[in-house]
Amino acid sequence: MVIRVYIASSSGSTAIKKKQQDVLCFLEANKIGFEEKDIAANEENRKWMRENVPEDSRPSTGYPLPPQIFNECQYRGDYDAFFEARENNAVYAFLGLTAPPGSKEAEAQANQQA
């Protein structure tokens, strides 16, 4: 399974840049494999992202803004959903991945099942 993070390399918004960097740095630090898909430099990436963000996750006006996160072709969420999952030690579940043994998330899952 490949995590795909749709970003905009040439965004003029500092907020978007910070959010993108936050997601990418977290994935790198936790050795979670991912692909960056640049919507600013590649029209196909932009089109695919816009078409595959579910209706209920789209803004009321305009297009969904990066970063948008997918596991293969399955939509996982935007930055706000990622941030909430990280705060709740549930990023692996958010991404649709199995938490590694010994992680806080794996321990929390084990405690819930007990």
Swiss-Prot record:
Region (Required for interaction with PFN1, HER2, and ATG12): 54-71
Compartments, record wording: Cytoplasm, Cytosol; Cell membrane
SUPFAM superfamilies referenced in this protein's UniProt entry, alphabetically: Thioredoxin-like
Motif SH3-binding in this chain: 61-67
Pfam family name, one: SH3BGR
GO BP of this protein: positive regulation of cytoplasmic translational initiation; proteasome-mediated ubiquitin-dependent protein catabolic process
Main location: cytoplasm
Keywords: Cell membrane, Cytoplasm, Membrane, SH3-binding
CC terms in the record's Gene Ontology section: cytosol; plasma membrane
Region (Required for interaction with HER2): 13-50
Comment block on domains: The SH3-binding domain is buried in the tertiary structure, and it therefore unclear whether it directly mediates protein-binding.
Subunit structure: Monomer. Interacts with PFN1/Profilin-1. Interacts with ERBB2. Interacts with ATG12. Interacts with BECN1. Interacts with translating ribosomes.
Function: Appears to function as an adapter protein that bridges proteins together or proteins with mRNAs. May function as a ubiquitin ligase-substrate adapter. Additionally, associates with translating cytoplasmic ribosomes and may promote the expression of specific mRNAs.
Protein name: Adapter Sh3bgrl
Organism listed in the record: Mus musculus (Mouse)
